[in-house]
Design a protein with these regions (language model features):
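A Zn2+-metalloprotease active-site environment signal
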Residues: 1-162
């Protein structure tokens, strides 16, 4: 799979640990094949509908729609959060950057989409899950990522579009 890092993430992150937390989460979506599982699930329902009404083009239409609007279920998001945190710990990287980034997102999300509409678990709940996992799986060997080049990298980012 491919993971694209946008400059917006680099601008919003306060330190490399936050970027590592986001990337660990996204890598888990790829490793767990969440996109494929979501497409197969949707295709299965589309095939059932198509066979029921006798219109196989419904299957093709549903697959095309799903490819354009992929999203992960709340369960898949929680799995990516949990496995991403464990991957950071296996790499001996402190996972608290993941927690800080979720807390930052929660501060921004409070006035946006109601939780019952979103496919993602509410950010505050995700932050609490990460906090609980960190407490349940201590990693004394884990260290923060070095940040000596962090500010220079952020300063080198292209200007934001107006």
């Amino acid at each position: 799979g491919i993971i694209v890092v946008h400059t917006g993430l680099l601008r919003q992150a306060s330190d490399p640990g936050e970027v590592a937390g986001v990337l660990a989460h996204e890598v888990q979506h790829v490793e767990q094949r969440h996109s494929l599982r979501q497409m197969i699930s949707s295709l299965g329902w589309g095939a059932l509908v198509g066979l029921t009404i006798g219109d196989i083009s419904a299957v093709a239409a549903m697959l095309a729609h799903q490819a354009g609007t992929l999203y992960f279920s709340r369960d898949m998001e929680q799995e990516a959060d949990r496995l991403g945190l464990l991957a950071l710990q296996r790499a001996q990287i402190r996972p608290d950057g993941m927690l800080r980034f979720f807390q930052k997102l929660d501060d921004e999300d409070k006035a946006k989409v109601p939780g019952w509409i979103s496919s993602h678990p509410q950010t505050a709940a995700r932050a609490q899950q990460i906090r609980s996992l960190i407490a349940a799986t201590p990693c004394p060997a884990c260290v923060p990522l070095a940040s000596q080049h962090w500010q220079a990298m952020k300063a080198a980012l292209p200007p934001t579009a107006k």
